[in-house]
Regions:
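Aromatic- and Gly/Pro-enriched helix-to-coil junctions and flexible linker segments
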Residues: 4-281, 343, 362-511, 519-555
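Conserved phosphate-binding loops in nucleotide/dinucleotide-binding enzymes
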Residues: 61-67, 666-672, 737
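An acidic, gly/pro-interrupted, aromatic-rich
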Residues: 77-81, 156-165, 263-265, 273, ...
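Generic structural signal for individual residues within well-ordered alpha-helical segments
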Residues: 101, 182, 200, 212, ...
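Recognition helices and adjacent regulatory flanks at domain boundaries
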Residues: 168, 697, 731-735
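Short acidic, glycine/serine/threonine-rich helix-capping segments at coil-helix boundaries
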Residues: 170-175, 515-517, 721-725, 729-730
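Alpha-helix C-terminal capping segments
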Residues: 393, 397, 733-738
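Helix-loop-helix junctions that connect adjacent transmembrane helices in secondary transporters/permeases
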Residues: 461-464, 728-737
Length: 759
């Protein structure tokens, strides 16, 4: 295709040109050109290779690729500019203008290319050496370290925290006030604010066991599971629609959400929780609870055949997405980086990626009916005539145009509305041997470029290298995967699990990259503590509630968020990784909405069941869906349920939730952002939800306090921020009320930092 890079131009490359090549040119060649123009390409197109200096100089079939110093005569530049018939990369979007400018500059500098000789394949992994990396080492249970200030220690983990602080000349902050502490622990464990009565009872209780009793009560609350589940649903990219252009609804996906809530409330051991999600159908095919757990596999975005007509390719995309999320959620590894080539940073060969994917090769979607065969037959008969008419209309609409097309589309909507509700199902999975995907290493991740065949096997860095592959026709491959993930010798699963719990309570994990424990991820701020907690999790039968309890009863957790030595500590530890004070945090989107509902008296605490579609701007819905795809409940009380029960659609997120950093649900979300920007203030001051609930709060305050403005202000502050108003706050509030603005006063409370933040 293209040819010739002048040897003289690259013989003595200047430093700037070489730097430009290495930083700007070579990465683009590797990402955009090597697929067709390198030694590893399935077929070298145009006879041109660009993966070495010598190969580039030799050129291809159509002449010189580069004329050093003259971009106008360089065919490579013409090709990436898409001039004439030469277009590179072929059948892909044109390179960005800035990238093309880099190539032009490189040619003007004489096209310096420091590569010498033939490209050499990377050396095989030295797994023995790779296992020396901290994350792949066995979990070590060390005794808690000795500390100077023994009086500060309430729990063993305090010794690890205090030892780190003392080693750096720091001290922990004083204890938090009881008012701050109850608000903190209530939001952390239930996602809801404490009532004024609960706050007063706790602050007036002088018993040394008062806080312990509070923690135990909250851990036993059914709202504990709702709060804990939200964090997990982020990790597993929970949504009830498939995204892309159709955003197809996955009926009854909410059963997975309820399964997770119940699992956390029941304190289901984490190894069992993991196993049921990976292989619940293999454990008990007809058990609704186990099948609900396997909805985990169905939660990812899916491009259906209309957007991807090649069924085998679509299947590959689904398996890829599931493999990636298993690696992120349970192993804390970016295994997806080994899909197209060996992982650049972690000891994960491409072959290992497809071996991991092979555990899923026989997994097929399967909707478990929750009605009898007789009931199903009646439903089918009721739907038969409507479905036949729909088939006729859909054939007709393909040929129609203009007004006729609109008329038929309306008829389709009318017929769809007549369909009886579908049978209750669980959108789970099962193994189908005859539909098992033959697994191969895919060269560059391309479905058509199949390399050597592979069968299921764990990641090599985490097992004995002599371990053979599992037979491809193993009847329960995912059970074997779950068994490996939860083996006592497997170091990542317990570390990743306890790190997520730590993050829930302190805002930042001991490893602050919870989905990446690899070389590109963060190193643990307190590795001994991480391992001690991981071993404690396994010793306690993988139960999570004892871990929560231990953290919450520690002095590390009960610190104030205002350290008197902050000015010194922040210079030594600017991110507060060693916990010299508690990290103040903004409430999540769900917590803000639920808190406004609770304070206003509108919160509906109904648990479980179908997800709720809350009112959203009709114009916004109309742009994305048919009216039937966003049907607001006729029961207005349903709109006031907790945020975890709102439907999670990929193509339309509730604007209030989006502005406060609710995740996009396209991939695993290991940690929420906590941004601060103008649209948040606009939402809280001018948004329909905040104003509606401010009105409800104003009415509640009048009902509870009557016309006594002093009492009303006191009650308002106790409800909203869990304390009485300061003198200045009281005076300002009374002035506001004298102006006859009770709703605006209530709205101002929602906008206080004391409402939006936990100390």
């Amino acid at each position: 295709m293209l040819a010739g890079i002048d040897a003289a131009a690259a013989a003595t490359p200047d430093e700037a040109g070489v730097r430009l090549f290495r930083e700007k040119i070579q990465p683009v060649l590797e990402a955009s050109c090597y697929e067709c123009h390198s030694a590893t390409a399935t077929k070298i197109k145009g006879g041109l290779r660009l993966d070495s200096r010598e190969a580039s100089r030799h050129g291809g079939e159509t002449g010189p690729a580069v004329v050093p110093g003259d971009p106008r005569k360089s065919l490579l530049i013409q090709a990436i500019r898409h001039e004439g018939d030469l277009q590179m990369p072929a059948k892909k979007p044109k390179l960005a203008d800035a990238v093309i400018a880099d190539f032009v500059k490189w040619v003007e500098l004489g096209a310096p290319d420091p590569r010498e000789g033939e490209p050499t394949p990377p050396p095989p992994y030295d797994f023995k050496k790779a296992r020396q990396f901290w994350a792949f080492q066995p979990v070590k249970r060390l005794d808690p370290p000795t500390v100077k200030d023994r009086r500060w220690v309430k729990a063993p983990l305090d010794q690890f925290i205090l030892a780190k602080l003392e080693a750096h000349g720091l001290r922990p902050a004083p204890p938090a006030s009881k008012a701050d502490l109850i608000r903190r622990v209530c939001f952390d464990l239930t996602g809801l604010p404490p009532s004024p009565e609960e706050i007063k009872a706790f602050t007036e209780d002088r018993s040394p066991k008062a806080y312990e009793r509070l923690v135990d009560r909250l851990l036993a609350s059914p709202h504990f599971g709702e709060r804990a589940a939200q964090s997990w649903l982020d990790v597993v990219r929970y949504a009830e629609t498939e995204g892309f252009e159709y955003d197809r609804h996955l009926p009854d996906a909410w059963r997975y959400r309820d399964y997770v809530i119940n699992a956390f409330n029941q304190d289901k051991p984490f190894n069992q929780f993991l196993t049921e999600q990976i292989a619940g159908d293999e454990m008990a095919p007809d058990d609704p609870e186990k099948q609900s757990a396997t909805v985990f596999h169905r939660l990812g975005p899916v491009r259906r055949n209309a957007g991807n007509p090649e069924i085998a390719l679509s299947r590959n995309e689904i398996l890829t997405e599931r493999t990636d999320v298993i690696g992120a959620a349970f192993l804390g590894l970016t295994v997806g980086c080994a899909r197209c080539h060996d992982h650049k940073f972690d000891p994960i060969p491409q072959k290992d990626y497809y071996r991991l994917q092979a555990y899923l090769a026989g997994t097929q979607e399967y909707d478990l009916l929750l009605i009898s065969a007789g009931e199903k037959k009646v439903l089918d008969q009721q739907s038969l005539g409507i479905n036949n008419e729909l088939k006729r209309l859909r054939r007709a609409v393909e040929k129609a145009e203009g007004a006729e097309r609109e008329k038929i589309e309306k008829q389709i909507e009318e017929q769809e509305a007549r369909l009886p509700p579908g049978p209750a199902t669980i959108p789970g999975i099962r193994n189908v041997a005859e539909q098992r995907t033959e697994m191969h290493v895919l060269k560059r991740g391309v479905w058509e470029n199949k390399g050597e065949p592979v069968a299921p096997r764990p990641l090599s860095v985490l097992v004995n290298e002599a371990l053979p592959e599992l037979p491809a026709d193993s009847p329960k491959p995912r059970t074997e995967l779950a068994r490996w993930l939860t083996e006592s010798s497997q170091p990542l699963t317990p570390r990743v699990a306890v790190n997520r719990i730590w993050q829930q309570h302190f805002g930042l994990g001991l490893v602050k990259t919870p989905n990446d424990f690899g070389a590109n991820g963060d190193r643990p701020s307190n590795p001994e503590l991480l391992d001690w907690m991981a071993s404690e999790l396994v010793r306690n039968g993988w139960r999570l509630k004892p871990l929560h309890r231990m953290i919450l009863l520690s002095n590390a957790y009960q610190q104030s968020s205002r350290s008197p030595m902050a000015a010194v500590a922040i210079k030594v530890d600017p991110e507060n990784r060693w916990l010299w004070q508690f990290n103040r945090r903004r409430l999540s989107a769900e917590e803000i909405r639920d808190a406004m509902l609770a304070v206003s008296g509108r919160l509906n605490l109904k648990q479980g069941g179908r997800s709720v579609m809350v009112p959203v701007d009709k114009e916004l819905v109309r742009q994305l869906y048919k009216p039937s795809q966003w049907e607001v409940s006729r029961d207005v009380a349903e709109n006031d349920r907790r945020s975890i029960y709102m439907i999670a659609k990929r193509n339309l997120r509730v604007p209030f939730m989006e502005v406060f950093d609710a995740p996009a649900l396209l991939t695993s979300c290991p940690a929420r952002e906590s941004s601060t920007h103008a649209p948040q203030a606009l939402e809280m001051l001018n948004g329909k939800l905040s104003n509606e609930l401010a009105g409800a709060l104003a009415r509640r305050l009048r009902q509870e306090a009557g016309q006594n403005s002093q009492r009303l202000v006191d009650r308002a502050f106790w409800l909203a921020v869990g304390r009485p108003p300061t003198r200045e706050e009281r005076n300002l509030s009374l002035d506001y009320l004298r102006g006859g603005l009770p709703k605006e006063f209530a709205l101002s409370l929602f906008n206080l930092n004391a409402f939006l933040y936990v100390q």
